[in-house]
Amino acid sequence: MTLNLKTPFPTFGGSTGGWLRAAEVEEKYAITWTSAKEQIFEMPTGGSAIMRNGENLLYLARKEQCLALSTQLRTFKINDYKIYRIFPSGEVQYLHPKDGVFPEKVNPGRTSVNSRGFSIGKNPNPASIKFSGITTYES
């Protein structure tokens, strides 16, 4: 995955409150998405901006800010966003969604972690296994 640095930024009249100053020394994050129309959205750093029609690129200082913006983009029915980490050396690392499928969606190749093969109503009664030597999460 490559990041096109020529992608236009959303129109934003405010500032990031100094968030990106430290990002120039350490690392910063970029989120890209495609919008079907110009519309106003809330910035994770405060204030609002106008996303451009077509491709958009926004630099943020924290990955959490990118994830917060991605949650908001999904309310606009925008699901093609990508999050990148950019190091001061210029190296770009693709972060999210890692295997091309969002974490809450089912991917045939993805193995489930910490899943139970039954619904929560079928959990054993903790009192019945209390002194059996088996922990409740292993039963």
Swiss-Prot record:
Top-rank lineage group of the source organism: Eukaryota
Coiled coil residues, start to end: none
InterPro entries: PsaD, PsaD_sf
Topology in the lipid bilayer: Peripheral membrane protein
Principal subcellular localisation of the protein: plastid
Location in the cell: Plastid, Chloroplast thylakoid membrane
This protein's UniProt keywords: Chloroplast, Membrane, Photosynthesis, Photosystem I, Plastid, Thylakoid
Signal peptide region: none
Pfam family of the protein (one): PsaD
GO biological process: photosynthesis
Keyword presence, Cytoplasm: no
Cellular component terms (Gene Ontology): chloroplast thylakoid membrane; photosystem I reaction center
Job description of the protein: PsaD can form complexes with ferredoxin and ferredoxin-oxidoreductase in photosystem I (PS I) reaction center.
Similarity section: Belongs to the PsaD family.
PANTHER family in alphabetical order: PHOTOSYSTEM I REACTION CENTER SUBUNIT II, CHLOROPLASTIC, PHOTOSYSTEM I REACTION CENTER SUBUNIT II-1, CHLOROPLASTIC-RELATED
Name recorded for this polypeptide: Photosystem I reaction center subunit II
Gene that produces this protein: psaD
